[in-house]
Swiss-Prot record:
Membrane topology, from the record: Multi-pass membrane protein
Keyword match Nucleus: no
Taxonomic lineage of the native organism: Bacteria, Bacillati, Actinomycetota, Actinomycetes, Mycobacteriales
Keywords from the UniProt entry: Cell membrane, Membrane, Transmembrane, Transmembrane helix, Transport
Family listed: Belongs to the autoinducer-2 exporter (AI-2E) (TC 2.A.86) family.
Gene Ontology CC: plasma membrane
Domain of life: Bacteria
Transmembrane feature ranges: 7-27, 32-52, 66-86, 159-179, 218-238, 241-261, 263-283, 319-339
Localisation: Cell membrane
Name of this chain's protein: Putative transport protein MT1133
Species: Mycobacterium tuberculosis (strain CDC 1551 / Oshkosh)
Length: 385
């Protein structure tokens, strides 16, 4: 093929290439999140894939890495959700036993008196809750909940084929990115008009942010969630440990933290008579749970992946708004791309020194391997050699 194009032909080819890339992005827009999740998984499990390739061929190494990734994610999450479901069933049974042994009419009268007493204390509020109004409200809530569950089950059954299709696509994309990562890296560097050095900078920043988000946000959130659930259990509330662990972990992933649950819960325990337990929950959250982030973040999050707290908060919520739950990862990655672009602009046009890459930490081998020709008493190689 003759590649000696004229200047006009080169410009036309560049425009056609840009149009093709934009059309490809538009064509695959419905699978953008799926591709990003597969790319994140492939990046995180690349060290394990390299370890397998030293012992097996490429195909077997990719299969072992895929199975390891599924086991590392599906098994713990499935076990935790299963335990939470068991605890929910036990709580439902305990509530049913309580209903059978409690005079609901007397309890309902006490609740109505309490609510009406609270309304009477509020100025300019003339509301009286009656048993009929409460009954109608409960019927309306039950109908709405039933309709929501019906729509949820209908959508879940209808999307089963879509879930299977997405899972198959994820496996293929994950394996393809895992095996062809170096080719893809070279291709991105060749297509980027800014050059391969800037491409390496972008990829390094993105990789650091992915590792920082997964290792930092998720691991720290899991530690904070378990710590918060443990404090509630120790304080005397022995129902729903795993439920609290899941809820507090999910809240800790979002920068608001699990304090929006544990602090009101501790205050409620104080008002209901468990003063020592409530104070323990509050102090545990303020002294232990909040400091888990301060202790683990410098260890788990790379320095070049740390954003300003305001930018991190905005990127997480903007990502959740645009991409759903996966926006917790995608949002900070997009924000680090914006920040890196500004840094490159300042370095090129304003002469601001660009931040250099961090040297990777030295990995110490506690049991170093010796080759067959290596001896403990062998002299070191000379400079002349």
């Amino acid at each position: 093929m003759n590649t000696e194009f004229t200047l006009t032909q080169k410009r036309a080819l560049a425009i056609l290439t840009l149009i093709a890339l934009l059309f490809g992005a538009y064509f695959l827009r419905n699978y953008f999140v799926l591709i990003v999740v597969a790319a994140v998984g492939a990046y995180l499990f690349t060290p394990l894939f390299k370890w397998f390739t030293k012992r097996f061929n490429t195909g077997l190494s990719a299969a072992c890495t895929l199975l390891s990734a599924l086991a590392a994610v599906v098994v713990p999450v499935g076990a935790l959700v299963g335990l939470a479901i068991v605890q929910i069933a036990r709580m439902v049974d305990s509530v049913a036993d309580w209903v059978r042994t409690t005079d609901l009419s007397t309890l309902g009268d006490k609740i109505l008196q309490f609510v009406n007493g609270l309304f009477d204390r509020v100025p300019f509020l003339h509301i009286t809750v009656t048993a009929d109004a409460l009954r109608k409200a409960m019927i309306s809530v039950a109908q709405n909940v039933g309709e929501w569950l019906l729509h949820f089950l209908r959508d879940a059954a209808g999307s089963l084929a879509g879930v299977i299709t997405s899972a198959i696509i994820f496996v293929y994309v994950f394996v393809a990115l895992l095996v062809n990562r170096e080719k893809l890296r070279t291709l991105i560097g060749q297509l980027n008009p800014l050059g391969e050095d800037v491409t390496d900078l972008y990829l390094q920043k993105m990789g650091s942010m992915v590792r920082g988000t997964v290792n930092g946000q998720f691991v720290i959130a899991a530690c904070q969630g378990v710590a918060g659930a443990a404090s509630i259990y120790i304080a005397g509330f022995h129902h729903g440990f795993f439920i609290f662990a899941i809820v507090l972990t999910a809240l800790s992933i979002i920068p608001l933290g699990g304090g929006i649950v544990t602090i009101p819960f501790g205050i409620g325990m104080i008002f209901y008579g468990n003063i020592a337990g409530g104070i323990f929950v509050l102090l545990w959250h303020l002294l232990v749970v909040t400091n888990i982030d301060n202790v683990l973040r410098p260890i788990l999050v790379p320095r070049d992946a740390r954003l300003n707290s305001a930018l991190m908060l905005l990127s997480v919520f903007a990502g959740i708004t645009m991409f759903g739950p996966w926006g917790i990862i995608i949002g900070p990655v997009l924000m680090i791309l914006i920040v890196t672009t500004i840094d490159v602009y300042l370095a090129v046009y304003k002469g601001v020194e660009l931040e250099q890459f961090e040297a990777p930490p030295v990995r110490r081998r506690w049991l170093p391997r010796r080759g067959p020709a290596t001896s403990r008493n062998a002299p070191p190689p000379s400079t002349a050699e």
